[in-house]
UniProtKB/Swiss-Prot annotation:
It comes from Homo sapiens (Human). GO terms for cellular component: axon cytoplasm; cleavage furrow; cytoplasmic side of early endosome membrane; cytoplasmic side of plasma membrane; cytosol; early endosome; early endosome membrane; endomembrane system. Belongs to the small GTPase superfamily. Rab family. One of its GO terms (biological process) is regulation of exocytosis. Its EC number is 3.6.5.2. This is Ras-related protein Rab-21. It is a lipid-anchor. Residues 223-225 form a propeptide. A motif (Switch 1) lies at residues 43-56. Residues 188-225 are annotated as: Disordered. It comes from the Eukaryota.
Amino acid sequence: MAAAGGGGGGAAAAGRAYSFKVVLLGEGCVGKTSLVLRYCENKFNDKHITTLQASFLTKKLNIGGKRVNLAIWDTAGQERFHALGPIYYRDSNGAILVYDITDEDSFQKVKNWVKELRKMLGNEICLCIVGNKIDLEKERHVSIQEAESYAESVGAKHYHTSAKQNKGIEELFLDLCKRMIETAQVDERAKGNGSSQPGTARRGVQIIDDEPQAQTSGGGCCSSG
């Protein structure tokens, strides 16, 4: 059973793991679902997959001896579902904001998501801005320099991916996990020093007993709503 991280001590103690929630946001057709399926199941479907509301996949990792359980939420990109965004990104430790490199408008919409996330969750959430479909480089409409400069200006990191060719995806999630671990460790040290502020644990690391988790988690895709 999950329990919120308490005082000092490493979260990666024997039999325990970091538990992080990551949400994918972006317009429809940018490839969010394809990225998640490629990462979690190494699957790719050329046909467009429309996500209705949200779904999630789970992934277990071992990074530098630290166990990590990821819950990756894939949200719908259609405008009519935008108002549901806060339901899915609240309490998130990380956000992956995806745009299609052949679609300038999808990049502009990412900027709106960044503003919303910073307003609602502050600077604690780790942001990744992802230019997907680099297999269509000849059709690129979003400048690499512009995208990378923007990401840096908002405290995010920029990545280049192709779900079709399976490029850049492992690097994206590995780097994000490392950043979330670093953030969680800073929070743990702050709590250990008695300097935590009200609400600090809102996106704090969750400590999970690994054995009970293994018994109760199916590890598959669970649709929401």
